[in-house]
Amino acid sequence: MESPRNHGGSEEEEYSSCESGWTMYIEDAFHGNDQSSVVVDDDDDDTQVKEADDGYENDDGDTSDDGGDEESDDSMASDASSGPSNQLPKHINKHAARKNGSKQVYLQKRQHTEKTISNEGEKSDLKARTRTSAASRVQSRGKVSKTK
């Protein structure tokens, strides 16, 4: 593997060993060392590949870099793990739904726990009343048996 290069920083600055060739390629493009029109946004979740606006206009007044009807070769812009960009909004919605779903599960568990505590309180009150009434029955039987 090629050793990490310094891209416009001081000579003392070093890159970590986990930096990939893609990162260096993208940094070159970003800092103007390359004429590439591809920018990769590598967040914690997914990698997104976007075409950057380089500000140059084509002969027909269009600012895109596609060269007319020609199909662009963006094999260098993505890897096998990245899917079509139209899947990103679905993933975000699923993530938000999953996040809200976990809140809903938490609230349901909390409500269930509160109901259980409430039911246990009612059960203990019922047991206390039952004990009191059973004790009073025993006392009343004792009185009845003494009178006979």
UniProtKB/Swiss-Prot annotation:
Residues that span the membrane, as ranges: none
Biased composition (Basic and acidic residues): 1-10, 111-128
Top-level taxon: Eukaryota
Bias (Basic residues) ranges: 91-101
InterPro entries given in the database record: SOFL (IPR044670)
A biological process term (GO) from this entry: cytokinin-activated signaling pathway
Family of the protein in this entry: Belongs to the SOFL plant protein family.
Function per UniProt: Involved in cytokinin-mediated development. Together with SOFL2, triggers the endogenous content of specific bioactive cytokinins derived from the biosynthetic intermediates trans-zeatin riboside monophosphate (tZRMP) and N(6)-(Delta(2)-isopentenyl)adenosine monophosphate (iPRMP) such as N-glucosides trans-zeatin 7-glucoside (tZ7G), cis-zeatin 7-glucoside (cZ7G) and N(6)-(Delta(2)-isopentenyl)adenine 7-glucoside (iP7G).
Name listed for the protein in its UniProt record: Protein SOB FIVE-LIKE 1
Naturally occurring in which organism (per UniProt): Arabidopsis thaliana
